[in-house]
Amino acid sequence: MRGPIVLLTYLLNSWTVCATVRAHVGTAPGKTPQVQALPSLREQAKLLDGWTEERKALIPGLLRKYGVDAWLMSQREYAEDTVFWALKEATQFSARRRTTHLFLADPVDGAPSSYSWIENTEVVWTELRQILATQQPRSIALNTHSEIAFSGGLHAGELDAVVKGVGEEWKDRFVLEPMLGVELVATMVKSRLPWYQKMMETAWAIIEEGFSEKTIVPGKSTSWDIEWWMREKIQSLNYTTWFQPSVFILTGKGFPAADDPSASMDDPRAPDRPIEYGDLIHTDFGVSALGLNTDTQHIGYVLYPGETEADVPKGMIEGLKKVNRLQDIVKSNMKVGMTGNEILKASIEQMRSEGIQGKIYCHATGEWGHSAGTVIGMTNLQDKVPVLGDLPLLRNTYYSIELFAEHFVPERNRTIVFPQEEDVYWDDATNSWQWVYGRQEELLLIRTPAVDGMEAPTEL
């Protein structure tokens, strides 16, 4: 029986949920995600090269936008500049010999706006000096930033080679413009979106199968069992991933992003701890294909034998509703041109004004899982993020809205963290951020047929 102290704690800590509290089998109303097959490798290469050419065509405009006349990138095999991966052809698996690129904002005398070399002799430097002498760029950007990976990919040894190769006369014209690398990598051309949406649907479909009675056997399956099932499932579909899937049992303790000091005492993903009836489980999961990466976090609930949606603890459903509200808050504050730190500040102020406790840690995604762009909070940095948080939010990119809300669950007599992560894209038609596939608004339910003599406990 729920005592008066527990009830009072619930009333003080609970967030008012205006919508009707429900739970269903699916993740989002009206959506039944299906695995989307990838095209042949040859067709994938055509798609990739087409997207790359679209993006390369944007470079002269980027140079003009940031007031730079030329952009020079150079790398050796297995020591690539980070931006190299946004420029390479689909059938290139690394740089070769010395791979060098020069881009010009406004070439003179009908010259091309870009040049590339794959060379292991002095020819590259001789020809490069000739082009620079003809074009006379006043500024030449190099990717030498010390804090931003997408603007700091020029290796130290290669920088020495560049300075020696082009000569001291050009050294004074070298400049650092970090937004060149950031914006080039961040920009997602429109033709990529349909495939990104298919990839996201596939990720949802794998999660829904993994968090179902098809895969989870209560009392037997462990979190690690489900993680490796997900990994094998990805591989079987000819997709890959950019991180190991994780599955956590949300007990109210031990969730890493919550910085809970009791984590060592209550490991939510201990390999020998089976998933049990009544568990609230969470996954962080992504798939990779076609030079793109997804990033998703969903939660599910393990019903007791014979239970239905109506038996899900209401506090858990309310927790999901609360984190949905936090998603709305962050998405509405993501104004193009604002810095990540400004968005973080506005979002946290609104979050607290609505009585929500949680954390916000959003990042760009797409080309890389943690891709180029501003950062909106980190799990350990909720006031501001140095350097990365000071970058402006760009349009025409993808973002992972990653966060959690805390909610007191009276049926467990404890506060539980409710994490969520969904990807969004910039939509020019609505001038706003839209979910790539959707967002989780209903708990995933793991069902078990009724067992004679077994009933769910009334108190946990």
Please provide the spans of the model-predicted regions:
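Fungal secretory targeting signals
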Residues: 1-20
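Active-site neighborhoods and metal-handling regions in enzymes and metal-associated proteins
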Residues: 20-460
